[in-house]
Amino acid sequence: MTQPLRIIFAGTPDFAARHLQALIQSEHQIVGVYSQPDRPAGRGKKLKASEVKELALEHNLPVFQPQSLKTEDALNELTRLNADIMIVVAYGLILPKAILDAPRLGCLNVHGSILPRWRGAAPIQRAIWAGDEQTGVTIMQMNEGLDTGDMLHISRCPISATETSASLYTKLADLGPGALIDTINNLANGKITPEPQNDAAANYAKKLSKDEANIDWSMSAAQIERNIRAFNPWPVCFTQMGGQPVKIYQAHVVEQSSSQPDNNGRVLSSDKNGVIVGCGEHALCITQLQPQGKKPMAINDFLNGRSDWVTPGTILGENNE
């Protein structure tokens, strides 16, 4: 029998809500839920609650939405909850040392990588971007550094050759809650030995940008193909076709014996099987894309109306009308 813990949960998006759901179903007591303030959303810009707040209210849990945790009032409010531990999952606010030290057992974080690899903001996307063959979820004890705390639990999962950030996000969102509950139970029973991270092996997962999604055809076809998967569903890779940015959703590498620099971005062929484009190394076959104002479509549907955009010899990435 695990000794039930008094838990504060802090998180904001769906990924966090799945972990909160697991805690609600556990034998532990949730004494407070922290989430980002409601934000304007949709065309009407009406205030929208986070997925975590909505779930907490469904279960009549007390919700707190401070703009910052750095004030004395925020610290006093949290301290009054008399929590044993605080669980932080994709919360979005910085936790100062006073907050980290407030719960009896400190604060735990669920991070979407096998630490110390991919510390930082975009671990799921960067694992695909780099061509990693596996990733996972690390439960760690938080300190003042950026994802530098001692590791308490690691669960691993493979990254498939067709993995997108959306599909990997779902895998880790399924993997994390069970890992979190196991960790909390073992911590409550004194069965965990924290493992320090090897800082020398660490690297950082910087945020994605729309600029980075603009395809650089001088890159290898393999890197571009990984970018397409890593940047799906956001910001989505794109290139200029017919004078407008066109999003690329699916493609695969076509090996070539040699690559010519003047073929970077050049359409080598186009038919119902795909548009083959020269790259810095090998070539890329585009099979699904999305012109402005349209839904994503198979290449055959695209060619029915826009074949003139990808005639052989055309250079993609240039503003050719």
From Swiss-Prot:
It comes from the Bacteria. Belongs to the Fmt family. Pfam families: Formyl_trans_C, Formyl_trans_N. Attaches a formyl group to the free amino group of methionyl-tRNA(fMet). The formyl group appears to play a dual role in the initiator identity of N-formylmethionyl-tRNA by promoting its recognition by IF2 and preventing the misappropriation of this tRNA by the elongation apparatus. InterPro entries: Fmt, Formyl_trans_C, Formyl_trans_C_sf, Formyl_transf_N, Formyl_transf_N_sf, Formyl_transferase-like_C_sf, GART_AS, Met-tRNA-FMT_C. One of its GO terms (cellular component) is cytosol. Keywords: Protein biosynthesis, Transferase. One of its GO terms (molecular function) is methionyl-tRNA formyltransferase activity. It catalyses: L-methionyl-tRNA(fMet) + (6R)-10-formyltetrahydrofolate = N-formyl-L-methionyl-tRNA(fMet) + (6S)-5,6,7,8-tetrahydrofolate + H(+). PROSITE patterns: GART. This is Methionyl-tRNA formyltransferase. SUPFAM superfamilies: FMT C-terminal domain-like, Formyltransferase.
